[in-house]
A protein has these predicted regions:
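Short cytoplasmic-facing helical segments at TM-TM junctions of multi-pass membrane proteins
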Residues: 126-149, 230-234
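Short, membrane-interfacial amphipathic segments enriched in basic
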Residues: 2-48, 223-228
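Active-site cofactor/substrate anionic-group-binding motifs, chiefly glycine-
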Residues: 51-107
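Hydrophobic alpha-helical transmembrane segments of integral membrane proteins
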Residues: 145-153, 245-264
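Membrane-interfacial helix-loop-helix connectors in multipass membrane proteins
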Residues: 77-100, 168-210, 219-240, 260-269
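Hydrophobic transmembrane alpha-helical segments of multi-pass transport and channel proteins
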Residues: 160-164, 168, 198-214, 242-251, ...
Length: 269
């Protein structure tokens, strides 16, 4: 006699597993197409540049507006802790490493996941419900080659640029708060930052941002290409793309942070 609870659980898990499989397959095939087209000179660079510029225009100013409060909050919280233990000179090191390894890549993921993913899912979803995707296939044009791969490269390039911009603005805001509001000497701030922070921390930030951008675009493209039911279906796909993309970035960030802690020990002096 079958267990009804077991059957209901399988019915709920199976669609999610199938969707995950289609997303992984879309990501693998789009990546293969991207690499192959670049190697053979068939990649539509013009489309990729247009998409990259679009992502820059919709995320650059929000990145600055998001980075400054993050830097201020980090400086206030860390400053109060370091002051209580008599280690004001360590504010630059602690704040800088936290910004580079965690704050900046996650902030870039939020921006790309909010603005970039919604734009990709909305555009591809609108084309899907208008049967433009089917028309491309009828004409022998691969939608993944024509639409997904350029956006994949564009976001993968723009995401680390946003992360670096957030790092610069957040550290600058944190520095100003530390020296103007907490009495930290500017020399000791930068000395501790330069002593404990390294190029490896910045590289981790850039790699994280690239992975997050890649993940967000693949999820958004999958939701857009599978949109059904007219405008309502497009809206549902956009909402799902944003939520799933950001949640996926959070989960991946935990995994990457654990791997970094295991295999890349911090600098000790």
């Amino acid at each position: 006699m079958s267990n009804p609870l077991h059957g209901n659980a399988l019915e709920r898990v199976a669609p999610t597993a199938r969707t995950l499989g289609r997303t992984v397959r879309l990501g693998a095939r789009s990546t293969w197409i991207l690499v192959a087209d670049i190697a053979t000179g068939r990649f539509p660079w013009r489309e990729a540049i247009v998409q990259a510029w679009f992502f820059v225009t919709v995320t650059a100013i929000p990145a600055v507006l998001l980075a400054v409060p993050f830097g201020v909050v980090i400086a206030v919280q860390i400053g109060s802790i370091t002051k209580s233990v008599g280690a004001n000179s360590m504010a630059g090191a602690v704040g800088g490493i936290a910004i580079m390894q965690q704050i900046a890549p996650m902030a870039a993921a939020l921006l790309v996941g909010g603005a970039g993913a919604s734009a990709v899912a909305a555009e591809l979803g609108a084309r899907t419900v208008r049967d433009e995707i089917d028309a491309l296939r009828t004409m022998g044009i691969d939608p993944q080659r024509r639409l997904v791969s350029p956006r994949l490269l564009a976001v993968t390039i723009v995401s680390p640029m946003l992360a670096v911009l957030i790092v610069l603005m957040s550290i600058l805001a944190s520095f100003l708060v530390a020296i103007l509001g907490q009495g930290v000497a500017s020399g000791s701030y930068w000395l501790s930052f330069g002593t404990f922070a390294s190029v490896t921390d910045l590289a981790i930030c850039v790699v994280k941002a690239m992975i997050f951008g890649y993940l967000v675009v693949i999820v958004a493209a999958q939701r857009g290409l599978e949109a059904r039911g007219g405008p309502r279906g497009v809206a549902d796909g956009v909402n799902a793309a944003v939520v799933i993309g950001i949640v996926g970035c959070v989960v991946v960030n935990v995994l990457i942070s654990q791997l970094v802690a295991m295999f890349i020990p911090p600098r000790m002096y």
